[in-house]
Amino acid sequence: MPKSFYDAVGGAKTFDAIVSRFYAQVAEDEVLRRVYPEDDLAGAEERLRMFLEQYWGGPRTYSEQRGHPRLRMRHAPFRISLIERDAWLRCMHTAVASIDSETLDDEHRRELLDYLEMAAHSLVNSPF
C-alpha cells in the first residue's frame, strides 16, 4: 500500500512546522492580521493544521470536529482581494520553504504549493 502524502512528508511534525511558521508571519503581517478577527491566532492555527492534515491523508479530525471543510463558505465573511491572497501566499511560501528537502522533497513541495496556490486563488471574493 503506498504512503499517503501526509505520511511521505513526515506527518504531523511537518504540518505543525508549516502552520506554526505561517502563523508566526501572519501575526506580524499588517494585511493578513486584519483578516483574522480573533486576538489570539491559536484557533485559526489549529483549524488550518487539522484541515491540511486531513486533506493530505492524515487524521480526519477536521471533519470530525467541524464538518465538511466548505472553504469558500467559511471564508465568505472575510474580504479577500488579490492583496490578501498575495500576502497569504507569500507567508505560506516562506513557511513551506523553511522545511528541509529531506522532509519535503521537490515533488511533494511542488504538489503542496500548487494546491495552496489554487486554494488561495479560489477564495478571492473582492476586487479591492
Curated annotation (Swiss-Prot):
Pfam family, one: Bac_globin
Recorded topology in the membrane: Peripheral membrane protein
Protein localization: Cell membrane
GO terms for biological process, alphabetical: oxygen transport
Predominant place of localization: membrane
Cofactor note: Binds 1 heme group per subunit.
Binding site for heme: H75
Positions of transmembrane segments: none
Residue positions where 3',4'-dihydroxyphenylalanine is found in the record: Y36
InterPro entries in the record: GlbO/GLB3-like, Globin-like_sf, Globin/Proto, Globin_bac-like_CS, Hemoglobin_trunc
SUPFAM superfamilies listed in its UniProt record: Globin-like
Cofactor(s) annotated in UniProt: heme
PTM statement from Swiss-Prot or TrEMBL: Contains L-DOPA (3',4'-dihydroxyphenylalanine).
Cross-link Isodityrosine (Tyr-Tyr): residue positions: Y23-Y36
CC terms in the record's Gene Ontology section: plasma membrane
Molecular function terms from GO: heme binding; metal ion binding; oxygen binding; oxygen carrier activity
Keywords from the UniProt entry: Cell membrane, Heme, Hydroxylation, Iron, Membrane, Metal-binding, Oxygen transport, Transport
Origin: domain of life: Bacteria
Record-stated family: Belongs to the truncated hemoglobin family. Group II subfamily.
Subunit annotation: Homododecamer.
PANTHER family assigned to the protein according to its UniProt record, in alphabetical order: TWO-ON-TWO HEMOGLOBIN-3 (PTHR47366:SF1)
Main function: When expressed in E.coli and M.smegmatis, HbO increases oxygen uptake. Membrane vesicles of E.coli carrying HbO show a respiration activity about twice that of membranes without HbO. HbO seems to interact with a terminal oxidase. Therefore, HbO could participate in oxygen/electron-transfer process, suggesting a function related to the facilitation of oxygen transfer during aerobic metabolism of M.tuberculosis.
Protein name: Group 2 truncated hemoglobin GlbO
